[in-house]
């Protein structure tokens, strides 16, 4: 089976060590493991490093079953902004030009959405050639654009972004099948596009492979954390990720002022890091160690009592299961999050953490875990069990590969 994958904004096999594999790399690896060949289309610009892998179109033959094709674009310096939209438009334009010269079509394609523009260009090209397409929807673009505006401005914003709404609905309807990370998310996408669900529309959880961290790695990580003053002598809760506008760190500041004996370890970087540091001024129990690698994350989890998933309650997360939730389950830690909807249901029904709010502050949830060691351990066990049942990497991606194989069989 010849498979095309289109996914920008994720790490690639050519990016070197220390990268966290996401949908594109994970699916590529599983397909190759199953004996299939993959052409992975992506951007020549790295979303993670904000650097160009190449300034022009390049093709990289990784092995006999994997080729990576890099589409050039202008790039951008911030996660959110006009430059990113311009980059995506240029990316789609260049992809369209490359496809005009393409002579070989795949048996099936798996297209990441967003970006809207590249997904639209490739799905249209494939539809004309009667190639089945699975559209993997991971974010609620362009609705997220409108949500970023004050409510009074949202009707105007919806008019401004109308072309994106038109293009996204057309692309979703053109797809042979949809995939999403949570049932509520899939239903939202179908409602948004006014599309009936079909037998090929499926939920495939966003998850990552385990392993790869050795005892030596953990030993080195422990020494590094000792230097940072994080050794587990005091209870620890932590956040790992990019400091972005989609997170609300104010509840952490309030909890840190109240719980002076707790260490709040906030790891990562991003556009909003400076603002978060200003919010935490004078709080010696809040630690910013910067970006950390996998061994440091795993050791930090071993000495922590809970993981923080401080998402704002916006539609994109209310109907979804964001990666910070999955990460906590993988690490076997109780989840502390304000998210309603899909995540709140998951937390309550599986007893894997707490949903904090103005009525049930974050600090109270943390104090409860400290005072109830048996409950903390039980929630940790529940988290591991839930991960194994619903988010296990091999189960998810073996199922996804089988799904693609069956779709191709049914087309022939």
Put a short name on every predicted segment.
Residues 93, 100, 117-120, 124-128, ...:
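Membrane-proximal helix-turn-helix segments that form the acceptor-binding/catalytic region
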Residues 368, 375-390:
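A short, well-ordered alpha-helix in the C-terminal region of glycosyltransferases
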Residues 349-360, 368-374:
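Conserved acidic donor-binding segment of nucleotide-sugar-dependent glycosyltransferases
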Residues 176, 301-318, 333:
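Acidic donor-binding loop of glycosyltransferase active sites
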């Amino acid at each position: 089976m010849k498979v095309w994958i289109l996914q920008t904004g994720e790490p690639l096999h050519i990016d070197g060590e220390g990268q966290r594999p996401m949908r594109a790399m994970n699916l590529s690896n599983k397909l190759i493991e199953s004996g299939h060949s993959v052409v992975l289309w992506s951007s020549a610009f790295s979303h993670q490093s904000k650097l160009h892998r190449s300034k022009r179109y390049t093709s990289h033959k990784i092995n006999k079953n994997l080729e990576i094709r890099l589409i050039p674009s202008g790039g951008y310096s911030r996660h959110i902004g006009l430059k990113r939209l311009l980059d995506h438009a240029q990316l789609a334009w260049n992809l369209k030009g490359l496809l005009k010269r393409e002579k070989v079509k795949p048996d099936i394609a798996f297209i990441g959405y967003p970006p809207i523009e590249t997904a639209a260009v490739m799905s249209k090209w494939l539809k004309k050639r009667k190639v089945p397409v699975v559209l993997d929807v991971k974010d609620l673009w362009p609705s997220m654009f409108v949500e970023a505006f004050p409510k009074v401005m949202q009707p105007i914003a919806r008019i401004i972004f109308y072309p994106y709404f038109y293009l996204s609905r057309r692309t979703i309807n053109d797809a042979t099948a949809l995939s999403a990370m949570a049932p509520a998310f899939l239903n939202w996408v179908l409602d948004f596009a006014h599309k009936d669900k079909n037998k090929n529309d499926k939920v495939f959880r966003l998850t990552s492979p385990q392993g790869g961290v050795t005892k030596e790695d953990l030993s080195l990580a422990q020494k590094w954390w000792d230097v940072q003053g994080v050794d587990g002598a005091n209870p620890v809760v932590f956040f790992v990720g990019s400091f972005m506008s989609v997170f609300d760190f104010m509840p952490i500041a309030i909890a840190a002022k109240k719980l002076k004996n707790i260490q709040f370890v906030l790891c990562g970087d991003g556009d909003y890091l400076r603002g978060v540091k200003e919010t935490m001024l004078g709080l010696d129990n809040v630690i910013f160690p910067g970006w950390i690698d996998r061994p440091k994350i795993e050791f930090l989890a071993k000495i922590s009592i809970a993981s923080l998933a401080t998402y704002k309650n916006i539609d994109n997360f209310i109907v979804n299961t964001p990666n910070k939730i999955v990460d906590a389950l993988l690490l076997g830690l109780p989840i502390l999050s304000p998210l309603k909807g899909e995540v709140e249901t998951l937390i309550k029904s599986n007893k894997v953490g707490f949903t904090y709010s103005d009525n049930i502050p974050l600090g109270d949830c943390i104090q409860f875990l400290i005072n109830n060691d048996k409950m903390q351990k039980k929630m940790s066990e529940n988290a591991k069990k839930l991960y194994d049942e619903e988010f296990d990497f091999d189960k998810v991606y073996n199922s996804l590969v089988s799904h693609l194989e069956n779709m191709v069989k049914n087309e022939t």
